[in-house]
């Protein structure tokens, strides 16, 4: 035990000290004695035996803060690697569904219910369920690869989106949070600290939002005050002094804009940060992990490179604020978000951002660990690039990044990247409502299979309903395809022109028909480039199958009905008696074939046959059906006539050649030639001014004049007489063929007229007709 004796001080010359000297603070003296007096005093040591101070000294344990050089991996609780009050929440966060995600979430629940139902019933619907799951994944992929700007804003603001410290916890080996701006305040909205990634030490600075209401209040919803920016500035100086690369994480709606912050110098703090960051000689990398609002984000965002997560946004004013200013209502936020160009893809095009870090489908909150690893990869890659630069090169690199933003050359024409179809294609993706209908249909099939164990054939009403629904979906697919290939406006204009031309006042003109055919051909050619081509193709195939099934079902039903009606007609007493009498006479005659029957019996058989056929024809007419067999027989008869009489065929071909040569001769005359040229000019004018009635009327008048001139020339050339003679020969040959055919059904007067006209149309050149 060691003893230390108390020593006293004897003061000399104290009488010269003033009273005010003894009233000074202890910081200016020792034991109440002013330093000024101590400087003039004479010291003597007096030992007092009646007073002693004792203390017990022992060797203390030396601590290594914050981490030992060689930590024991088997220590209880594991090696501490994270020094901060923040702790991960794990899976305790309540799931939040955004408005545009609700249809897919409900669909996913239904697919789960269908799988559960199939397992309970023991029925095998594996293929259908797998198909639905694949379609669901494709719909999810289409949704998140074609998000609108306002949808990306909503994802960036998602309550469960991982925060700055969540990513730090996932990517750093060790991290120690540093507090305070050394001016009496520690803003929790900005978190700073030193951490290591793969053995390399970095200074991390970032905005920190809350993960629940309590944390949001503590973190002020990620909106920093001047104290927060001054804390970040202090850490930047610290990193620059020690040579630590700086990594900043941006996730704030903006700097806190209350009256107190303005009094404390919010603008000055942000401006000071901007000025200082341009002079730091260490690498600076900024990553936008959520939303970056105006100067509040830029105060820690002046970096050599700025990267953005796929669904992050960066703006000078929020879409709601912009809409309130320009459109006087926040409901125009979707349009404002599109006009502001605040998404990662747009900002990379504008050279504001330098790269995009991918996110999983569903956003960063769907898989925070995977997102953090992508951030870690991006940090390592960019820091390896910056590590090859000196301090001066880093300053030049940082300056060049911001100098190239917004650069354009006035007066110099720039070729567009796309010279054809400059209209931007609209995103087309799978409709979750259609997929939901398929899920409901499968669910009904499972329930039906559970009750009947066999899937019944759908009724005609169900089939018609499915076909109509499929036609409606195909119309929607065609509309989406037209929008995607950039033909929507032309199709709309063509529809209007067609509706005018098809009305009573307007006639359909060949010019319009030709334009329609050209547009149709162009649409069919470009249809394969549409994003929804495969979906449209599958639905067309499905419609074809349904139509065939419907036709087969109707044919079967019609066949049954016809057989039933025929049987009823044959079973009538008068018909049955005649048929039975004929059968008895034929049996008593002993003839083995029709040719061996007597002539009187033949006539009787043919007469009875005609009566039965007439009765059956009446049955068909009563059902609203017509007989095509007669017309087919007429066609076959004409072919037989041409085959039997080669001379008649030669005459017909020769007459056609004469008519063609005469028409060509007439067209080459100066009068007709000038009329044809005028017709071409009027047709060209009409194609440039669609919908003009006068142009079409003028074209029709010219066509009628040309046709009349050609008809007059043909009538005066003697070709009409040749045609009349040839028609007489054809009629005689037709009568002869009709007499030779046994048991043929005779045609009525109307059919004779039709066949005559048909013969003319087959015989005479179409241009002459």
From Swiss-Prot:
GO cellular component: acetyl-CoA carboxylase complex; chloroplast; chloroplast envelope; chloroplast inner membrane; chloroplast stroma; endoplasmic reticulum; plastid
Region (Disordered): 718-769
Tissue expression summary: Accumulates in fatty acids synthesizing tissues such as embryos, expanding leaves, flower buds, flowers, and developing siliques.
Topological type in the membrane: Peripheral membrane protein
PROSITE patterns: COA_CT_CTER
Pfam families associated with the record: ACCA (PF03255)
Reaction(s) this enzyme catalyzes, per UniProt: N(6)-carboxybiotinyl-L-lysyl-[protein] + acetyl-CoA = N(6)-biotinyl-L-lysyl-[protein] + malonyl-CoA
Ranges in coiled-coil conformation: 426-504, 631-744
Domain of life: Eukaryota
Biased composition annotated in UniProt, kind: Acidic residues: 738-756
Purpose: Component of the acetyl coenzyme A carboxylase (ACC) complex. First, biotin carboxylase catalyzes the carboxylation of biotin on its carrier protein (BCCP) and then the CO(2) group is transferred by the carboxyltransferase to acetyl-CoA to form malonyl-CoA.
Family: Belongs to the AccA family.
PANTHER family, sorted: ACETYL-COENZYME A CARBOXYLASE CARBOXYL TRANSFERASE SUBUNIT ALPHA, ACETYL-COENZYME A CARBOXYLASE CARBOXYL TRANSFERASE SUBUNIT ALPHA, CHLOROPLASTIC
Protein's recorded name: Acetyl-coenzyme A carboxylase carboxyl transferase subunit alpha, chloroplastic
Taxonomic source organism: Arabidopsis thaliana (Mouse-ear cress)
Organism taxonomic ancestry: Eukaryota, Viridiplantae, Streptophyta, Embryophyta, Tracheophyta
